Amino acid sequence: MSMQSNSSDASSATVDPAEIAKFSRLSAQWWDPTGKMAPLHKINPLRLSFIRDAACRKFERNAKSLNCLSGLRMIDIGCGAGLLCEPFTRLGAQVIGVDPSATNIAAAKLHAEKSQLLIDYRCTTVEQMDPRERFDIVLAMEVIEHVTDVGAFLARCAAITKPGGLMVVATLNRNWKSFALAIVGAEYVMRWLPRGTHQWDKFVTPDELTKHLHNNKLAVTEQAGLVYNPLADKWSLSADMDVNYMVVAETAAG
């Protein structure tokens, strides 16, 4: 999840400047597991294992191997301070993290250096990347609900996905349950997130997302909801996609 940037290079057709400014203000707190980004830290292991397992099934790897993603090129679009980039680098992937917020990228580079990890972080947008670049795995995690044009954004993501590659998208469904839990509950009652982090009308239903992916010649192969248990303070995968959900889609082999 990430999105005014400190770099004029970060302008693009689908990036919302207000969204960039919002997440830039949070950038210094990205790596604090007890701070304002705590919900992301709690859900991160689940996202990581879901993506890893999907990639290992697709590319016929052993998910238990410490370098199971070795040789695979991955991009995390809207990478924030690198909460997914770092663990996937440790699993052997060649990772590029892009984010339009210069402060997020600075935080990501600093943490990667401290962790002695080599990650290619770029303050840019997917629209501004070299159109010849291609990736085995394209991640757009909690990003599409912050862009101005979901269709245009996903079209660009699809364009950089290799033939036979994977795209993984995580976002929020749009219904009254998601309004009650993701906005009223998370931002006003529990105060997990700063008020205004999300706009309910920007949430995307699974049907809408599937249609966008299909329009870009991507076939949905897996999907799962993420459900929070307040008593256990734990997230788990579920068939319930009413609020948070993830979708895996594949491009046709070349």
From Swiss-Prot:
Keywords of this entry: Methyltransferase, S-adenosyl-L-methionine, Transferase, Ubiquinone biosynthesis
Q: In which pathway does it act?
A: Cofactor biosynthesis; ubiquinone biosynthesis
Q: Which residues are S-adenosyl-L-methionine-binding? A: 47, 78, 99, 141
Instruction: Name the reaction it catalyses.
Output: a 3-demethylubiquinol + S-adenosyl-L-methionine = a ubiquinol + S-adenosyl-L-homocysteine + H(+); a 3-(all-trans-polyprenyl)benzene-1,2-diol + S-adenosyl-L-methionine = a 2-methoxy-6-(all-trans-polyprenyl)phenol + S-adenosyl-L-homocysteine + H(+)
Single GO term (MF): polyprenyldihydroxybenzoate methyltransferase activity
**Where does the record place a coiled coil?**
none
Instruction: Describe the task this protein carries out.
Output: O-methyltransferase that catalyzes the 2 O-methylation steps in the ubiquinone biosynthetic pathway.
Entry protein name: Ubiquinone biosynthesis O-methyltransferase
Q: Which organism is it from?
A: Rhodopseudomonas palustris (strain BisB18)
Q: Which gene encodes it?
A: ubiG
